[in-house]
Amino acid sequence: LAAKDNNVAGLLIAGEIEAGIVQLNELRQAIVKFKESKKPVIGWIENTSQREYYLTSVADKIYMHPASEVELKGLASYNMYYGEMLKLFGVGVQVTKVGKYKSAVEPFLGDKMSEPAREQTTQLLNGVWNRLLTDVSVSRQVTIASLRRAADDAGIYNAEKAKSLKLIDGIRQRDELITELRKIGAGADESGTSFRQISLAKYAHKVQLPRRGERIAIVYAEGEIVDGWGGVGEIGGDRLARDLRELRADPRLRAVVLRVNSPGGSAFASDIIAREVGLLRNKGIPVVVSMGDLAASGGY
């Protein structure tokens, strides 16, 4: 929508963001689509984390504050193990699990990661890291090998070094960034000291989508799956099943997008939800599942 909006001169990627790699990748894809409009996309770095840089790297130009740093250090997984400590207190743990890769309970059983858990974690991290490097390489027009060296050599870089590594395009103070943004068409704000801007959240709120006619429902399944109704941040099996049942009865419904971001949980609640999804499909209503950062166990 912003790509077609004549009131939008361009896009600025800046600030902190709390999101997983999957969500950031989806944002990157949306920005790549926005760039087809030929409107400029500018990235701004002030002490940026690796995840934030991954998103920012999609910009046409990236500017960095001279006193800030940027991370590019690779991925790692750290786990705590309590098995030996529990034994000291006379606490025994009995677990029933299916398959050698079901590692969620390992922290309560021993004092180190099992080889199957290490194998699957390593494979996951390598896959995500390779995707991240590939995306940054394409956006920044640098080799994957050079990005690997940057991550191995230090992992955190100041502005001058980041520029020499081609992680950024230029070094600017905040007032100089404002000047750059005005050059690409951003008008001055009411105070005359900054530029006219609107956040993504406020822009999405202002945009009016059609409310009549046929519908596609977007259902969010976010959090741990629990029996019953569930609370804030949980997927209650009964509650989500009821929502899906009500959608099935809506004559205007043409499809359902089920957004899953869950580590799993209750097998019973998961089965109740899966049954309602199946009934939607049996009625001829397409169900498209969009997986977020987590779609594990019952979530899958």
Annotate each PLM feature:
Residues 63-64, 168-174:
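Short acidic-hydrophobic, aromatic-tinged amphipathic segments that line or gate anion-handling sites
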Residues 154-157:
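Extended, domain-scale alpha-helical bundle/helix-rich regions
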Residues 1-152, 182-289, 293-300:
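Small-residue-centered hinge/linker elements
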Residues 175-183:
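A ligand-binding cleft/hinge motif common to bilobed small-molecule-binding domains
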